[in-house]
């Protein structure tokens, strides 16, 4: 059981997500009343993976809360890459669809990179298209990956100084690690990117003022690996029979952190909320 004295150190992703959703709802209402446009999100799901279905449902519920029109496009698992690309092309040309989300992972015979590159950069709600990634690398942040965007929002809301601080990212994926590094560099942090193969990971994490962990390894980060007062974002998630765990040993690390996200209820809700914000951005830019 967590000591009540530590509760003020928890970054409540659900509360932050509600704030973002309220902003999006207001923006959606403005678009509808002033321009007669309802932002629309198309979600593409290939196959019947239970986890993917659950994630799509979560996103559709968020759409309902903010007034975004969501439509699901289902393809059987034995569909071809060509059929997927044809669907994406039709959605690119559908003026009622402002954002497109391709739910990953895809069945093994698909090329996810080719499919993501087929999505119009203007409708790339996930922020994964190389065009949008390239803009991020030169400091032009528009449609960026949702999880790093959520982390930045949390840093801003909690007034965490970033400029000149040591930021360490554990994980170098295209979804979190690499864009997270770019966004922190854009704010003049001194950034180190590590991963599960890094020699002496502890040497790096001990120096982190801001630590973002997205390695997908249960309790990879222990209390002796972080310094007093660090701000920690746990992006990892591991599901086991007895519960859901993050990459950070939360109950022990919170005793040293100044701020920390829990799993669940931390970065996850913020990620979905930022997706809603991106769909609104896509709709506004389509005018």
From Swiss-Prot:
The keyword Cell membrane does not apply. Disulfide bonds: none annotated. It catalyses: (6R)-5,10-methylene-5,6,7,8-tetrahydrofolate + NADP(+) = (6R)-5,10-methenyltetrahydrofolate + NADPH; (6R)-5,10-methenyltetrahydrofolate + H2O = (6R)-10-formyltetrahydrofolate + H(+). It comes from the Archaea. Its EC number is 1.5.1.5, 3.5.4.9. NADP(+) binds at residues 171-173, 196, 237. GO terms for molecular function: methenyltetrahydrofolate cyclohydrolase activity; methylenetetrahydrofolate dehydrogenase (NADP+) activity. Pathway: One-carbon metabolism; tetrahydrofolate interconversion. GO terms for biological process: L-histidine biosynthetic process; methionine biosynthetic process; purine nucleotide biosynthetic process; tetrahydrofolate interconversion. InterPro entries: Aminoacid_DH-like_N_sf, NAD(P)-bd_dom_sf, THF_DH/CycHdrlase, THF_DH/CycHdrlase_cat_dom, THF_DH/CycHdrlase_CS, THF_DH/CycHdrlase_NAD-bd_dom. One of its GO terms (cellular component) is cytosol. Keywords: Amino-acid biosynthesis, Histidine biosynthesis, Hydrolase, Methionine biosynthesis, Multifunctional enzyme, NADP, One-carbon metabolism, Oxidoreductase, Purine biosynthesis. CDD domains: NAD_bind_m-THF_DH_Cyclohyd. Catalyzes the oxidation of 5,10-methylenetetrahydrofolate to 5,10-methenyltetrahydrofolate and then the hydrolysis of 5,10-methenyltetrahydrofolate to 10-formyltetrahydrofolate. HAMAP family: THF_DHG_CYH. Belongs to the tetrahydrofolate dehydrogenase/cyclohydrolase family. Homodimer. This is Bifunctional protein FolD. It comes from Methanosarcina mazei (strain ATCC BAA-159 / DSM 3647 / Goe1 / Go1 / JCM 11833 / OCM 88) (Methanosarcina frisia). The lineage of its organism: Archaea, Methanobacteriati, Methanobacteriota, Stenosarchaea group, Methanomicrobia.
């Amino acid at each position: 059981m967590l000591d009540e004295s530590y509760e003020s150190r928890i970054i409540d992703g659900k509360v932050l997500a509600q704030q973002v959703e309220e902003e999006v709802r207001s923006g959606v209402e403005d678009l509808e009343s002033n321009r007669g446009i309802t932002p629309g999100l198309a979600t593409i799901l290939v196959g019947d993976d239970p986890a993917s279905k659950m994630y799509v449902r979560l996103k559709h519920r968020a759409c309902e809360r903010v007034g975004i029109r969501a439509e699901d496009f289902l393809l059987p698992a034995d569909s071809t890459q060509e059929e997927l690309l044809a669907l994406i092309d039709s959605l690119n040309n559908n003026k009622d669809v402002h954002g497109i989300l391709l739910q990953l992972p895809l069945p093994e015979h698909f090329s996810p990179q080719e499919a993501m590159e087929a999505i119009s950069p203007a409708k790339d709600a996930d922020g994964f298209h190389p065009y949008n990634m390239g803009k991020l690398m030169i400091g032009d942040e528009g449609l960026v990956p949702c999880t790093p965007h959520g982390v930045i929002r949390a840093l801003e809301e909690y007034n965490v100084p970033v400029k000149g601080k040591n930021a360490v990212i554990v994980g170098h994926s295209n979804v979190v690690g690499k864009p997270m590094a770019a966004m922190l560099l854009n704010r003049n942090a001194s950034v180190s990117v590590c991963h599960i193969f890094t020699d002496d990971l502890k040497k790096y994490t001990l120096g982190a003022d801001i630590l973002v962990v997205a390695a997908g390894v249960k309790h990879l980060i222990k209390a002796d690996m972080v310094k007093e007062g660090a701000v920690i974002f746990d992006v990892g998630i591991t599901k086991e029979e007895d519960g859901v765990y993050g990459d950070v040993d939360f109950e022990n690390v919170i005793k040293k952190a100044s701020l920390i996200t829990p799993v669940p209820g931390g970065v996850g809700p913020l990620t979905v909320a930022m997706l809603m914000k991106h769909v609104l951005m896509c709709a506004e830019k389509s005018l």
